[in-house]
C-alpha cells in the first residue's frame, strides 16, 4: 500500500481528496496545506508519494518541489485546475512526475499514481546513468591530463 503525503490549498478539498485516496486503497500518512516546509515534512515522514492539489502551482510550491526532487527524490503528483502549458512545463521541470488537470475521481487515482511511479523510476534510472557517464568522463579527463604531464 502506497503511503501518501497529501498537500492541498483548501481544507474543504483535502477532505474530498483524502476520502477518494482511502476509497482507492491508499494510506494517507499526513495531510497539510501549502504553507508547510515540504522538504522538512518529506524527510520527517518519508512518504512513498507526495500528492499536491492546488488551483494553480505557484512559485513557492514549485521551489519546494525542486528541493524535494533534488534532496529526497520521490514521485510527486500534482492535481490542478491550471491547464496553461507554461505552468505544466514549469511543474515538470521542478520534478512533478504527473500533472493532472481538471478533477479527481477515485477510480482514476490508482492508474495515475501507477504512471507517476513508473515515470519517476524511469527518470531516476536515467539520472543515475547520466551521473555514471559524467564520472567516467571526469576520470578520463584526469587520465589524459596525467598522460600529458
Where are the language model's segments positioned?
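Short hydrophobic/Thr-rich beta-strand motif most characteristic of the beta2 strand and flanking loop
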Residues: 25-34
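C-terminal output/effector regions of signal-responsive regulators
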Residues: 128-149
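Receiver (REC) domain switch/output surface
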Residues: 20, 109-121
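Conserved acidic segment of CheY-like receiver
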Residues: 1-13, 17-21, 50
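C-terminal output helix
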Residues: 86, 104-113
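A short, hydrophobic beta-strand element within the central beta-sheet of small alpha/beta folds
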Residues: 73-83
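Conserved phosphotransfer microenvironments
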Residues: 14, 34-39, 48-68
Amino acid at each position: 500500500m502506497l503511503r501518501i503525503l497529501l498537500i492541498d490549498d483548501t481544507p474543504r478539498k483535502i477532505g474530498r481528496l483524502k476520502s477518494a485516496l482511502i476509497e482507492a486503497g491508499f494510506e494517507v500518512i499526513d495531510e497539510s496545506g501549502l504553507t508547510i516546509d515540504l522538504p522538512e515534512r518529506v524527510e520527517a515522514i518519508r512518504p512513498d508519494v507526495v500528492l499536491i492539489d492546488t488551483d494553480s502551482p505557484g512559485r513557492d510550491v514549485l521551489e519546494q518541489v525542486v528541493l524535494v526532487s533534488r534532496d529526497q527524490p520521490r514521485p510527486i503528483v500534482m492535481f490542478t485546475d491550471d491547464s496553461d502549458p507554461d505552468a505544466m512545463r514549469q511543474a515538470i521541470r521542478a520534478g512533478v512526475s504527473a500533472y493532472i488537470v481538471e478533477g479527481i475521481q477515485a477510480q482514476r487515482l490508482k492508474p495515475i499514481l501507477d504512471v507517476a511511479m513508473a515515470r519517476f523510476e524511469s527518470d531516476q534510472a536515467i539520472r543515475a546513468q547520466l551521473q555514471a557517464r559524467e564520472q567516467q568522463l571526469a576520470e578520463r579527463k584526469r587520465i589524459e591530463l596525467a598522460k600529458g604531464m
